[in-house]
Each structure stands twice: as C-alpha cells, then as structure tokens.
C-alpha cells in the first residue's frame, strides 16, 4: 500500500537532509535583482491556434521528443458547452489541426464541437486539460475531468498519430480512468468537494505522474493527491495522498523528474486562491511515485497575486479571473538543479521571482530573486529548461508595455543560470482581459471574464514555444471569442 515516508528515510539517497521539517522557521524575502534587463531575444512567430468563434482558455503545451515539429495544446472549449479541446501541429506551430468540427477529446462529454455528432461520454462538462508525450514520441496523452451531477472523474486519452485522433470513447474504446470522485451534492467550483487542477508529467522511463488538489468540503482543506501509471497509461495505481497535517490547503501541483536518477519532485502552493495560505512546498519520490517525502516549505509569498473575483482581486483595473501566484517548476539536467518560478507582489507590482536548489539537498534553496524587474504587473509565469544547454525560458502575461493597464505576453530567457536575462515582447497588440470572457447566461453582461488558470511553455534547442489565451474577433452580441495563441521565439 503506498504511504507517506519521512524525510530521514531518504537521506541516504541524497535527495533531502536530516534537518528537514514540515515548515522551516522562516523564508527569505525576495532578493534585490543584480542582472541585465536590456537585451532582447530574436525572431518571433505568433499564430492563432483555435481560429473559431467562441472561447477557449487554459492552454498546456507538449512537444514530441522524437519529432519537435509535432506539438499538442489543450484547452477548455466553450463551442458547445464546456469541454476538453485539443489542437496539434506538425510543422513547428505554423499551422494547427482545426478546432471545428473535430478539435475535441471524445469519450468524456455527451457532446462534441459538431452539433450533429453526439459525444461518446457521459459527462455534462469537461475541463482542466493537461498534455504530454511518451519518451519515444509514439503516444500523446491528454487528461481532463468530466463532471455530471455529484460525480467527477479524471480521464486519460491517448493518441498514436501525434494528436490528430484520440481514444474514441464509449464501451468499445474507453479512456483510462485515473480516479473517480463523489461530490456528495456539492457543486463544481463551490466550497464543496471536487478535484481541481491536475497536471501530467511523463518521465524518461515512461512513468506517468498525474497530481491534483482535492477539495474535501471541510473548510479550506485541499490535500494533494497523485496517481501514477507504469504501463503507458493503460492503468493507474491507487492515488497517493502527498500533503497532510498542517500542509492541507493546497493547489497547483506539478511534477518534474531528474532523468539521471528518476527521482520525481512535486511542487505545490499552500492555497493562494481566495487569500488562503502563503507558502510553496516540495515533496520527493525516489521510487517512481510509490511513496513521497513529507512536504518541505521552500519559499513564502510576501503578497500573492489573487485574481478570483468576487473573492479577491489585488491588482489595479477592472476585475477578471486569471492565474494567481503558483509555482512553475523545471529541472536542469546540466546543473542538477530544480528551479521554481512564481509571481508575487513586491513594492506594489506583481513580479516574477525565481529560486532553485541543487537536488543533492532539496532543503537548501537560493534566495528568491526578481527576474528582469518589470514596470507593470506580471500576473503569472510558466517556466521551462532546455535540457541540452540549461537555458532558462519563462513566459508571463505582462502589463509593462501599457502603463500597467493592459495585457501582453513577454518571453524572458537566461543562458547563464539566471545571472542575466533577455526580455522579448511576444504580442504586438495589448488587450484588456476584463473586456472579454467565456459565455455566461447568468451574468448581467453575458460574459464571465476568465482567461484560465495556466498557460504553456516548452524549450527547444533553438527556440522556446508557448501558448496562452488572448482575444479574437467578436462574433455575435458578446465578446466571448477568447482564442488559443502559439508563439515560437528565438533566444
């Protein structure tokens, strides 16, 4: 039976030290920046991926390790209801498989993007997409939740053609069940019982890690669970509860893996959304996900970004829902360091911060430092490392180009372990996320401003690729056409 293990039990493996505890007595404040911000990166290609008439958001990105021209991105898709959308490219992002009528993961919802074609799933709503590839590139993976009544389930779909087609669903071609949940009458998105924000990581040995937060319905309790597959996604072990005790109001769990040792590092935040909690944690597995160390606090938010109206909205301007402060981890195999980027409000402006630790002692972290200090809010960050060179790549929604009023996307990169940074404006036109949204029949203006809770970035030898939510042409009465955008940027 999988269980939690103590930090001391894995000291001999070199992953953690004896002096660890659930929480250290203090955490350093952000360090003063001492590096360049003046350089710009190279060529930028921006493409509208979804190219349709209604909203998408939450845009994870994965690249085929055997064919870097093949990438997939997922989304929450509002074309028919709220479901799980997908697009694939086979030319490095210049063109993508269409959203309509077939850019949809079958087997989850009762509908598809084609009103004439019913879905092969049983769920009324789907969401929270996550994507990955197998180490040999032969299989693409897509996970998302399905919701119907009191019941929620997390499913994994597979593609053997780079994302053109996916597991058909239905009794003859079922998806793989990762885990199932019963909400006991509590609605999705309420203060009740529901799972949220899964992610997916595939290690070089093929092990698949899928963590999520599970809101229990008891105040702010939302421990992190993780399910692991050792057979290419055909089945999953019973989920393991990673966080416990006083570390229980958690969210935004992600896993990165050291390719040399196979050790898995799971990071999460201590439930910033709604203003609860202030800390970032890491847990380690040295046995391919069977057991996990106690959670170790490696950083503390000073004033976390929280964009979840009406509960919280702590930057200037009209309110909208968007990513708050969460940890984005990446592993550098050239230095054996675990990096984590996150946003925090420092001196009144939301900035990107970076901290790291040598995995020989995961309790010793660098002092968090502001990355390429900005004149406007940077309200979220995604992080990736190019494994051959150790180049650090970040993307963020950035209000620095408009007097801290409108959104753009910035790409920020470092080739010297964060000593200096180059920043590139990726978007050409700024926009106001409070003026666009997803369809909402119960909202006074017909929309709910919501650009999703995460974006996507991957690092290639000669470029970084990224996906995000941005505005499209309005069709009809309401500005509900949020699109998936892709960019490739040369460092």
PLM region spans:
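Extracellular, repeat-based ectodomains that mediate carbohydrate processing or recognition
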Residues: 26-491
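Bacterial N-terminal signal peptides that target proteins for export
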Residues: 1-9
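Residue-level signal for mature regions of secreted extracellular proteins and peptides
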Residues: 10-14
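C-terminal motif of bacterial Sec signal peptides marking the signal peptidase cleavage site
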Residues: 16-19
């Amino acid at each position: 039976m999988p269980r939690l293990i103590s930090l001391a039990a894995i000291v001999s493996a070199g992953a953690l030290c004896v002096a660890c505890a659930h929480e250290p007595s203090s955490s350093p404040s952000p360090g003063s920046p001492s590096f360049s911000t003046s350089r710009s990166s190279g060529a930028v290609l921006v493409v509208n991926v979804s190219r349709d008439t209604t909203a998408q958001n939450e845009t994870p990105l994965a690249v085929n390790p055997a064919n870097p021209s093949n990438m997939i991105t997922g989304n929450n898709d509002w074309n028919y209801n709220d479901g799980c959308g997908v697009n694939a490219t086979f030319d490095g992002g210049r063109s993508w498989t269409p959203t309509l009528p077939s850019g949809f993961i079958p087997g989850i919802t009762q509908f598809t993007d084609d009103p004439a074609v019913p879905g092969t799933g049983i769920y009324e709503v789907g969401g929270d997409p996550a994507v990955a590839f197998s180490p040999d590139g032969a299989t693409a993976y897509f996970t998302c939740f399905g919701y119907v009544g009191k019941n929620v389930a997390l499913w994994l779909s597979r593609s053997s053609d780079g994302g053109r087609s996916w597991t058909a669903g239905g009794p003859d071609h079922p998806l793989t069940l990762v885990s199932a949940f019963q909400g006991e009458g509590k609605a999705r998105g309420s203060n009740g019982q529901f799972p949220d924000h899964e992610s997916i990581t595939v290690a070089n040995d093929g092990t698949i890690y899928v963590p999520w937060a599970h809101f229990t319905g008891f105040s702010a309790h939302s421990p992190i669970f993780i399910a692991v597959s050792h057979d290419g996604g055909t089945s999953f072990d019973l989920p393991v509860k990673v966080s416990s005790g006083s570390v229980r109001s958690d969210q935004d769990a992600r896993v990165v893996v050291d390719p040399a040792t196979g050790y898995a590092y799971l990071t999460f935040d201590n439930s910033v959304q709604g203003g609860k909690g202030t800390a970032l944690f890491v847990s380690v597995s040295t046995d391919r996900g069977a057991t996990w160390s106690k959670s170790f606090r490696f950083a503390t938010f000073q004033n976390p970004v929280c964009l979840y109206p009406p509960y919280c909205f702590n930057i200037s301007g009209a309110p909208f829902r968007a990513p708050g402060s969460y940890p984005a981890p990446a592993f550098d195999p050239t230095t054996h360091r675990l990096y984590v980027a996150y946003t925090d409000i420092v001196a009144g402006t939301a900035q990107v911060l970076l901290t790291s630790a040598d995995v020989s002692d995961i309790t010793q972290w660098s002092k968090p430092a502001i990355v390429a200090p900005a004149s406007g809010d940077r309200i979220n960050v995604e992080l990736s490392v190019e494994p051959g060179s150790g180049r650090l790549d970040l993307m963020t929604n950035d209000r620095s180009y408009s007097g801290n009023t409108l959104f753009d996307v910035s790409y920020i990169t470092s080739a010297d372990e964060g000593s200096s940074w180059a920043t590139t404006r990726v978007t050409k036109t700024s926009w106001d996320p409070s003026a666009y949204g997803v369809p909402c029949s119960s909202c006074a203006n017909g929309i709910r401003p919501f650009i999703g809770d995460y974006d996507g970035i991957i690092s290639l030898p000669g470029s970084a690729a990224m996906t995000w939510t941005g505005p499209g042409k309005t069709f009809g009465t309401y500005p509900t056409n949020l699109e998936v955008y892709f960019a490739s940027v040369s460092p």
